[in-house]
Amino acid sequence: MQLNSIKPAPGAKHPKRRVGRGIGSGLGKTAGRGHKGQKSRAGGFHKVGFEGGQMPLQRRLPKRGFVSPTKKNDAEVRLSALDRIPGDIIDILILKQAGLVSGSALNVKVILSGKIERAVKLQGIPVTKGAKAAIEAAGGSVE
């Protein structure tokens, strides 16, 4: 088989539909658009969400809530996730690079969930009491 001899499977390619080319084609006269009406005209499509002049749904429903300007950008990291990060020293930047916390996270806390098998050194990351005990039991430290 050569690259220049590759062809699509039989029936995989359909001929382009040519509309408005006589009644013998099956798609002549109205060209598949039906008779009259807005959708049969050139440029005859309304914008998404338009309901014919009726008050649209997004305007009929009341507003709700607000976006807090002081939203907390906190994240939690499981202890078992630290086991999968290469390297011995872990800080917030390394957690972001590993994809364990979002880039917008300002505060990160390690929680006791799962096990940690190797010694890691946490820098500038708060941990729960149980997580701290587990890290130190594995030979690691928290700064």
Curated annotation (Swiss-Prot):
Keywords, in A-Z order: Ribonucleoprotein, Ribosomal protein, RNA-binding, rRNA-binding
Region (Disordered): 1-54
InterPro entries on file: Ribosomal_uL15 (IPR030878), Ribosomal_uL15/eL18 (IPR021131), Ribosomal_uL15/eL18_sf (IPR036227), Ribosomal_uL15_bac-type (IPR005749), Ribosomal_uL15_CS (IPR001196)
A Gene Ontology term for the protein's cellular component: cytosolic large ribosomal subunit
GO function term, MF aspect, one: rRNA binding
Top-rank lineage group of the source organism: Bacteria
Entry annotated with the keyword Glycosyltransferase: no
Gene3D superfamilies: 3.100.10.10
Keyword Ribonucleoprotein attached: yes
BP term (GO), one: translation
Ranges of compositional bias, category Gly residues: 21-31
Pfam families, per database record: Ribosomal_L27A
Quaternary assembly: Part of the 50S ribosomal subunit.
Function description: Binds to the 23S rRNA.
Protein family (similarity comment): Belongs to the universal ribosomal protein uL15 family.
Name this polypeptide is given: Large ribosomal subunit protein uL15
Organism: Nitrosospira multiformis (strain ATCC 25196 / NCIMB 11849 / C 71)
